[in-house]
């Protein structure tokens, strides 16, 4: 194909992320949605969310991971996106040398750019904040991002009850 897998970067419930390169030796991250693991009745909603994730990644921002390509491998959709060699924010937690003000500014900049484009992230956590080689923080994983202009309903609330209500049930 167009990309060669370098290594695995991680996996979620229905997807896997790989470091890949194209034939001109540019490095990217490729997120593959593994539909063979998904019950048939939720495949289309997952594909729709994946498509929305790609489109959200097309927003121009220095603090959002950029999406470059979208396609299918044997019927399974993939997104090719910016590769962030610095890992995720969780690796900096507890490090007293971390420039917290700069990270906060980057994260808030990404959230602001999402909001200016009518989006909310809805899954902000250290694992979804990646670091570029120069230390710039960028937001990623827009899979459950939503349209901030649409009314919230119980169908689009994500998380465990104790996370939503602030209790440990």
Residue ranges and their predicted role:
Residues 70:
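Activation-segment/catalytic-loop signature of the eukaryotic protein kinase fold
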Residues 16:
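Conserved N-lobe ATP-binding subsite of Hanks-type protein kinase domains
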Residues 39-58:
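AlphaC helix of the eukaryotic protein kinase fold
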Residues 109-119:
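Protein kinase catalytic-loop region centered on the HRD/HxD motif
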Residues 103-104:
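Activation segment signature within eukaryotic-like protein kinase domains
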Residues 88-97:
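AlphaC helix of the protein kinase catalytic domain
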Residues 74-88:
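Conserved short submotifs of the Hanks-type protein kinase catalytic core
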């Amino acid at each position: 194909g167009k990309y060669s897998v370098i290594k695995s970067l991680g996996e979620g419930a229905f997807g896997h992320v790989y470091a890949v390169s194209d034939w001109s030796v540019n490095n990217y991250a490729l997120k593959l949605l593994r539909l063979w693991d998904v019950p048939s009745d939720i495949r289309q909603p997952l594909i729709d969310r994946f498509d929305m994730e790609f489109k959200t990644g097309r927003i121009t921002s220095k603090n959002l991971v950029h999406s470059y390509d979208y396609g299918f491998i044997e019927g399974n959709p993939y997104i090719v996106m910016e590769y962030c060699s610095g890992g995720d924010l969780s690796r900096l937690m507890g490090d007293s040398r971390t420039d917290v003000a700069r990270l906060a500014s980057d994260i808030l900049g990404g959230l602001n750019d999402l909001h200016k484009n009518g989006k909310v992230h809805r899954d902000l956590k250290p694992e979804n904040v990646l670091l570029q080689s120069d230390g710039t923080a960028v937001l990623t994983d827009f899979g459950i991002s939503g349209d901030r202009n649409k009314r919230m309903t119980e169908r689009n609330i994500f998380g465990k009850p104790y996370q939503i209500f602030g209790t440990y049930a």
